[in-house]
């Protein structure tokens, strides 16, 4: 079933009024003058506004995502909607009710948003691991899937300006980071090393930060939200990206990167679930299998840092959201260099 498209632009400066103008095209039973609105402020790529009938329940919430400025340069919005259409019947994503010129309307997933503290809870972490395994088991649409992280980084480099128009940004970039050409050669070298790991390519979320994970206490289950970066990628990349996000976004603290004992428990839960889904009789992964995935995940953490570092450079140029993307890029790329030697030296005997 195709998603209805409404020829309408949502006003990021006055979203409530522009939502009222089209609400009856989405839900005819709703009264535009009897709605309560609330804005989610955590996102740094898009603007997200929710509404429901005044005094209504969380189950009645409609979400309106307004795309960030120029995000269409690096996010395939048609593919994003197609991903929701695939995941919704499987119970992994809410329904999409309508698309607009600069966004879409979709359902709300009830539960509590995770944070760097709650995501470390052993029980919740195990639920997340199993859910990630479920996502990775989804059949890919591509016949010969290739890792998207590297292709995306190359694209990012093509749209980063050679020089930031803002003098302060340009000076800060030159002061702290290497040139674009140097960074490009660095990521090519990284890819050549990671390709040797031959981590299986799967359907990957690719943005498993804490606030994209919802825990439903009543059902004792987790789900993931926001699939704009979902694409084929190595298993180890998606898990590594999740571990990197333990550090948070607004106030990044990489001392929160999970220690080995936590990672091992997560990876054991992941592998057990993956084995169940594959119909294996023995669903107890060996210590060697866990150690191998541990090594792969930590080496792919370098790719995740590089991806979001270069992404931050793109956003520093194009985004109109009040967030210091350049400092975020610097933080991620610095973390890449700090971890590089240690992670690439890991081996699984």
Curated annotation (Swiss-Prot):
Organism, as annotated: Nematostella vectensis (Starlet sea anemone)
Protein name: Probable ethanolamine kinase
Chief location of this protein within or outside the cell: cytoplasm
Enzyme class label: transferase
EC number: 2.7.1.82
Summary of the function given for this chain in its UniProt record: Highly specific for ethanolamine phosphorylation. May be a rate-controlling step in phosphatidylethanolamine biosynthesis.
Gene it is expressed from: etnk
Reactions accelerated catalytically: ethanolamine + ATP = phosphoethanolamine + ADP + H(+)
Localization of this protein: Cytoplasm
